[in-house]
């Protein structure tokens, strides 16, 4: 039995939800998201409470049950409070600047890296810290992973782009021969 799937999702007053067949529509004052569900899951929306039930007893139906419960919960949290990820840029000469709809990164390459900011994502840059905010959890995580992939942290000095809560396992350098 899915513990995530059987959870009832409370929809706050700032978010409106509606069910149209197998499609769930969520919106707040600024944005709207929709979630297309599989026919193996039954959706129930009553008194601002959203719940899912598997249609069959097979493993596939139970898997969809938990998946759609988690996806719907992420949309509700995203529209009510939002998601954010913080990246830190460490290294001599590594700089970050916010341009016009682009993030300009100097990461020790022969050229600056220009990352176009996708729609629905907001970025704040303070010194060498990048904060990525948005209502779509998947998109916020994807943008953070793409920016980190330009220069992942290396294990010797820790230079590169890392998540703020990421712990880099450091390696010892070479020792001199005697």
Swiss-Prot record:
Organism lineage: Bacteria, Pseudomonadati, Campylobacterota, Epsilonproteobacteria, Campylobacterales
Gene Ontology MF, one: rRNA binding
The family this protein is said to belong to: Belongs to the universal ribosomal protein uL6 family.
Protein's name in the database: Large ribosomal subunit protein uL6
Primary role: This protein binds to the 23S rRNA, and is important in its secondary structure. It is located near the subunit interface in the base of the L7/L12 stalk, and near the tRNA binding site of the peptidyltransferase center.
Entry's Gene Ontology cellular component terms: cytosolic large ribosomal subunit
Keywords assigned by UniProt, alphabetized: Ribonucleoprotein, Ribosomal protein, RNA-binding, rRNA-binding
Source species, domain of life: Bacteria
InterPro entries: Ribosomal_uL6-like, Ribosomal_uL6-like_a/b-dom_sf, Ribosomal_uL6_a/b-dom, Ribosomal_uL6_bac-type, Ribosomal_uL6_CS
One GO biological process term: cytoplasmic translation
Cross-referenced HAMAP family: Ribosomal_uL6_B (MF_01365_B)
Assembly behavior: Part of the 50S ribosomal subunit.
Pfam families assigned: Ribosomal_L6 (PF00347)
């Amino acid at each position: 039995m899915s513990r995530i799937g059987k959870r009832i999702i409370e929809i706050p007053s700032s978010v409106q939800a509606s069910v149209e067949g197998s499609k769930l529509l969520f919106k707040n004052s600024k944005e709207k998201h929709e979630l297309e569900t599989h026919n193996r899951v039954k959706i129930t929306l009553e008194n601002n409470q959203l719940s899912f039930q598997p249609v069959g007893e097979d493993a596939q139906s139970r898997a969809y049950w938990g998946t759609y419960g988690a996806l719907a919960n992420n949309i509700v949290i995203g529209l009510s409070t939002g998601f954010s990820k913080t990246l830190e840029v460490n290294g001599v000469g590594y700089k970050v600047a916010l341009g016009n709809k682009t993030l300009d990164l100097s990461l020790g390459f022969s050229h600056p890296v220009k990352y176009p900011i996708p729609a629905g994502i907001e970025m704040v840059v303070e010194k060498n810290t990048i904060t990525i905010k948005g209502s779509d959890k998947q998109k916020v995580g994807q943008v953070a992973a793409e920016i980190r992939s330009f220069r992942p942290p290396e294990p010797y000095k820790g230079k590169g782009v890392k998540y703020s809560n990421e712990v880099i396992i450091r390696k010892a350098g070479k020792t001199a021969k005697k």
